[in-house]
Swiss-Prot record:
Residues 1-82 are annotated as: Disordered. This is Cullin-4. Part of an E3 ubiquitin-protein ligase complex including cul-4 and ddb-1. There is a cross-link at residue 786 (Glycyl lysine isopeptide (Lys-Gly) (interchain with G-Cter in NEDD8)). SMART domains: CULLIN (SM00182), Cullin_Nedd8 (SM00884). Residues 772-831 form the Cullin neddylation domain. GO terms for cellular component: Cul4-RING E3 ubiquitin ligase complex. Residues 33-48 have a biased composition (Basic and acidic residues). One of its GO terms (molecular function) is ubiquitin protein ligase binding. The lineage of its organism: Eukaryota, Metazoa, Ecdysozoa, Nematoda, Chromadorea. The keyword Ubl conjugation applies. Keywords: Isopeptide bond, Ubl conjugation, Ubl conjugation pathway. GO terms for biological process: DNA damage response; proteasome-mediated ubiquitin-dependent protein catabolic process; protein ubiquitination. Residues 1-11, 69-82 have a biased composition (Polar residues).
């Protein structure tokens, strides 16, 4: 069988995929062909010889090139029978370590002249090798050439045959290099780099195919004969690759230098990055660099070029671009270069190194400067994708996540302080909740991949705690009033218990940030008292649900008084049942009356005084007092008329009867109009003994207004319903029942008018809180000193600040210490003035 010459370079393009793989494998296709061609020749061989030949089907080249060397040690005697198996040993060496050695030694290239057949065999072999290298047809079959190689090796001429073959391949590689020199004379540029790569690609496309065919012909020499010698000789494939390396990349390991091929490859990659069409064997040439073991040198060159390029890009773009646009550009560059490397490089380390280099140059070196360019606008945009891109790119850099966290904290404080300073009271809590919801959305959507999520959440908590407590008393008051609105029966925004529970949880989060929780408690207690006394609570279960959440946050000591308020309400219901039994026992008419007996310790402080109660109401109150004395051993009750309410049956005119839900003061005032048609403020005060300010407040409520029931009207001005002048003018007017009352509902609730200003109410709460804080400071000092017996001032201050749950100044603590010294709970140490002793 005669083998045809390999196709020429021009026809190899149709087999580009096969040739690309030929640089990575040992051309199993060629070896398979060889096995078929040799099949006819094996019939005349011994079994031992067949075993040797059959080893040609083994795969020896891994991923495109040999990284192992072989050497043969031990007994290699050829005087035994031909079917005695030769012992072989494989010695592994680093090919690159040998790259700096001199070219393969040629040794003695004289074929033994005593055997004319050896010379004739070499002549045939060399002619056919030249034919393969020169793309000519071989004159001898591959089986015949294989037999001649075996014949020469059997005559102990293996080393000489090896050297002569290497010399031919060296000359062939030099001829290929000379064909490339014409192209290398032209200066390299982006517009001609593809031509250079195309020429180099053609050279590499042909080289491994030809030498692999030659290697298969000399397979016996490569696997058997050379392995039996005592010298360490490179396998043919490794030797041929080393020849290519030394020819086309001379001295590359002695001193790193960028070859023209490296520059051309980089230019082609940059053109691809700029979205220009590139027609060059880029992947094939990168594979070639791996095959001839210079890929690491190219990787160093590529990294240095990328570092220079992207450093210049960063310097140019950072001053001109905002944070979002710059991060979008960085992500695009990283993704596209990563894809380019994935397509053209097999080594995972190449992708990792390129990504790290681009990230370092574009982002690591730009932090924290780029984060100051419209960072707030990026967060304000609520674009989870853009914010997430910025965060994910920064967190890949050393200290990047910390910088984002710092900028995010500044943003939160800036926006939060602006809300505290500019929002009106009625909108502040809702704005804070909306801001918190937005930030939570960013945290879960954009920052979910944080390397340290605990620090990220702590950053959020610290920022909110910072600005919520900028005006701590105001924040505490408004948050408590927000709870009052949620739990009030007039709240129309709550459709079911689930919605209410969710809204309460959101408000609890704001409450958690408060430092002055005792201020919140004071306001919350007032709101709760109003809801309970006036029966305006949306649900007792909802009230207790909130109480449970507050207890979970702050402990039972915080909710002790609030829980006591509910205990009083439950006890009052029980008293109501017992009171009805008492009336029945005393043969008195059952009264439509409910009393709330409260423990002063639990409830807000209220001013109490006696007023003139109409007889029909006074008798019932007297009966309840008698009942309570019976129940509690002559203990008396004190009535808080300002907290009471009543239902009045009113007849404004024939056919117009209504039920009015009014406060106790409003009820007493309205009942006066059964005695006389007109009354002045002064007359009402005189007959009821109600404070003038309370009379004015309740008369205003009865006069009503827009969208409010007008139970009374002014006499002066023809019964004008218009409220004119000040409170002083109101005192000089007369009032009469509005006979034209037109409310459509049968039961009408009369609204309350609060004349007391917010400043006055705040002052009262502040005084109450300060008084309560004094007791808490005193108790904490005594508790600490009782346990420690003696402490210096600084240690005592430290332990106090750890135990107290509200903000307190050192001046306030010093005042309480002086008070305790005066009351002889503690004393100063006579030997150390800065220390205190506990007084038993």
């Amino acid at each position: 069988m005669t083998s045809g010459a390999p196709p020429t370079i021009s026809t190899e393009k149709s087999r580009s995929k096969q040739l690309r793989k030929s640089s990575k494998r040992t051309a199993s296709t060629v070896e398979g062909t060889e096995a078929k061609q040799m099949r006819g020749d094996t019939e005349n061989r011994s079994d031992g010889e067949m075993d040797d030949v059959s080893t040609s089907s083994e795969i020896r080249h891994g991923n495109g090139f040999i990284e192992n060397f072989r050497s043969q040690t031990g007994n290699s005697s050829r005087t035994t029978a031909t079917n005695e198996r030769i012992k072989k040993k494989l010695v592994i060496k680093n090919f690159k370590a040998n790259a700096n050695q001199n070219d393969v030694a040629m040794g003695d290239t004289n074929i033994d002249s005593t055997d004319g057949s050896v010379g004739r065999d070499w002549a045939v072999l060399s002619d056919n090798v030249f034919a393969i290298l020169e793309d000519r047809k071989t004159v001898t079959t591959l089986e015949g050439l294989f037999s001649k190689v075996r014949s020469v090796c059997d005559k102990n001429q293996s080393k000489v045959l090896y050297d002569r073959l290497v010399a031919i391949v060296v000359q062939f590689a030099k001829s290929l290099k000379e064909s490339l020199n014409a192209v290398e004379q032209v200066p390299l540029a982006e517009d001609n780099c593809e031509q250079y790569l195309e020429k180099f690609g053609q050279i590499w496309q042909a080289y491994p195919v030809k030498i692999n065919l030659i290697r298969n012909i000399f397979l016996h020499l490569d696997r058997i004969a050379l392995g039996a010698t005592d010298t360490e000789i490179l396998p043919l494939w490794e030797c041929f690759m080393q020849i290519f390396q030394k020819t086309f990349f001379p001295n590359i390991f002695k001193e790193f230098k960028a070859t023209k091929l490296f520059n051309a490859l980089y230019m082609a990659m940059q053109k691809i990055m700029q979205r220009y069409p590139v027609d060059s064997p880029l992947r094939s040439l990168v594979d070639m660099l791996q095959t001839v073991h210079v890929s690491e040198e190219f990787a160093k060159f590529l990294i240095s070029q990328l570092r220079e390029h992207y450093n210049n890009e960063r310097i140019d773009k950072v001053p001109k671009m905002n944070c979002n646009d710059y991060m979008e550009y960085c992500e695009d560059q990283i993704n596209r270069y990563s894809q380019l490397v994935k397509v053209n490089f097999d080594e995972p380390s190449a992708l990792k190194d390129v990504q790290a280099t681009v990230t370092n140059c574009l982002i690591q070196q730009a932090i924290p400067e780029i984060l100051t360019h419209d960072f707030d606008d990026l967060i304000d945009s609520d674009n989870i994708s853009d914010i997430g891109r910025m965060f994910n790119l920064c967190r890949q850099c050393v200290g990047g996540e910390d910088e984002v966290r710092t900028q995010f904290s500044k943003y939160l404080k800036k926006r939060g302080e602006k809300l505290i300073a500019t929002c009106p009271d009625e909108d502040l809590v809702s704005e804070l909740l909306a801001f918190k919801k937005k930030v939570d959305f960013i945290m879960t959507g954009s920052f979910k991949s944080a390397n340290d999520p605990v620090k990220m959440r702590q950053c959020l908590s610290d920022a909110f705690e910072s600005f919520v407590n900028k005006q701590v008393d105001r924040s505490a008051e408004l948050i408590s009033k927000h709870f009052h609105t949620l739990l009030h029966s007039s709240n129309k925004n709550v459709s079911d218990d689930t919605t209410l529970d969710q809204m309460v949880d959101e408000a609890i989060v704001l409450f958690r940030y408060l430092r002055g929780k005792d201020v919140f408690e004071a306001y919350y207690k007032r709101g709760l008292a109003k809801r309970l006394f006036l029966e305006r609570s949306a649900s007792v279960d909802a009230e207790k649900m909130v109480l449970c959440k507050l207890k979970t946050e702050c402990g039972s000591a915080f909710t002790y008084k609030l829980e006591g308020m509910f205990k009083d309400m439950d006890a009052s219901e029980n008293y109501g049942r017992l009171f009805n039994q008492y009336l029945e026992h005393m043969n008195k008419e059952k009264a439509n009356f409910t009393a709330r007996v409260i423990t002063p310790e639990y409830w807000p402080t209220y001013d109490t005084y006696e007023i003139n109660i109409p007889k029909e109401m006074r008798d019932t109150l007297t009966d309840y007092q008698d009942f309570y004395r019976v129940q509690h051993g002559n203990r008396n009750v004190k009535w808080h008329h300002g907290l009471a309410s009543a239902v009045i049956s009113a007849s404004f005119r024939p056919g117009c009867k209504k039920e009015l839900i009014a406060t106790m003061y409003q009820t007493v005032i309205l009942l006066l109009f059964n005695k006389c048609e007109t009354w002045t403020v002064a007359e009402i005060v005189e007959h009821t003994k109600i404070l003038e300010i309370e009379v004015v407040k309740n008369v205003l409520a009865l006069l009503g207004g827009r969208d409010k029931p007008k139970v009374l009207q002014r006499v002066e001005g023809g019964g004008s319903e218009k409220k004119e002048g000040t409170v002083e003018n109101l005192k000089n007017e007369k009032f009469v029942v509005n006979s034209k009352f037109t409310e459509k509902r049968c039961r009408v609730r009369i609204a309350q008018v609060n004349i007391k200003t917010a400043v006055e109410e705040t002052k009262e709460v502040k005084e109450e809180v300060n008084s309560d804080r004094q007791y808490k400071i005193d108790a904490a000092v005594v508790r600490i000193m009782k346990a420690r017996k003696q402490l210096n001032h600084q240690t005592l201050m430290t332990e106090l600040l750890q135990q107290l749950r509200f903000p307190v100044s050192t001046a306030d603590i010093k005042k309480r210490l002086e008070s305790l010294i005066e009351r002889e709970y503690i004393s100063r140490d006579p030997e150390e003035a800065s220390s205190y002793n506990y007084v038993a």
